[in-house]
UniProtKB/Swiss-Prot annotation:
Its EC number is 3.1.-.-. SMART domains: YqgFc. InterPro entries: RNaseH-like_sf, YqgF, YqgF/RNaseH-like_dom, YqgF/RNaseH-like_dom_sf. Belongs to the YqgF nuclease family. Pfam families: RuvX. GO terms for molecular function: nuclease activity. It is found in: Cytoplasm. The keyword Nuclease applies. Keywords: Cytoplasm, Hydrolase, Nuclease, Ribosome biogenesis. This is Putative pre-16S rRNA nuclease. It is an enzyme of class 3 (hydrolase). It comes from Acetivibrio thermocellus (strain ATCC 27405 / DSM 1237 / JCM 9322 / NBRC 103400 / NCIMB 10682 / NRRL B-4536 / VPI 7372) (Clostridium thermocellum). The keyword Ribosomal protein does not apply. One of its GO terms (cellular component) is cytosol.
Length: 141
């Protein structure tokens, strides 16, 4: 069973997908949107159907002290809309603290040019979010 990972943002949403066995996460795409939340909801719904996803992991931003700020509240609203749109999935909030930092470091180490970073940073962050969840499930090769 595949699991979808989401790095939610105000203008871009990074998407990652697990392998069929649920061991590894791979970058899938970035959904670009501005004000119409229907755009990402529709695309995520299509991906859930296309890949047979039953569980969606959404990166949940917390402050370093563990409190929930404005971005966290927006993410909760998005999760609520996602659950209303797609009834038969489990949506899990996953602590995303420092995932963007890790994604930027990965891109630096890979030598990805600054002009291309914006295109993939959200996907890489989604991979870190999803892989963290998958690793917590304790599957061993």
């Amino acid at each position: 069973m595949r699991v979808l990972g989401i790095d939610y943002g105000d203008s871009r949403i990074g998407i990652a997908i697990s392998d069929p066995l649920g061991w590894t996460a791979q970058a899938l795409e970035t959904i670009t949107w501005r004000s119409d939340v229907e755009v990402p909801l529709k695309r995520i719904s299509e991906l859930v159907e296309e890949y047979g996803v039953k569980t969606v992991i959404v990166g949940f931003p917390k402050n370093m002290d563990g409190t929930v700020g404005a971005r966290g509240e927006k993410t909760i609203e998005f999760i609520d809309l996602l659950q209303q749109r797609i009834k038969d999935i489990e949506v899990i909030k996953w602590d995303e603290r420092l995932t963007t930092v890790a994604a930027n470091r990965t891109m630096y180490e890979m030598g990805i040019k600054k002009s291309k970073k914006k295109l993939v940073v959200d996907q890489i962050a989604a991979v870190y979010i999803l892989q963290g969840y998958l690793d917590s499930k304790g599957k061993v090769l």
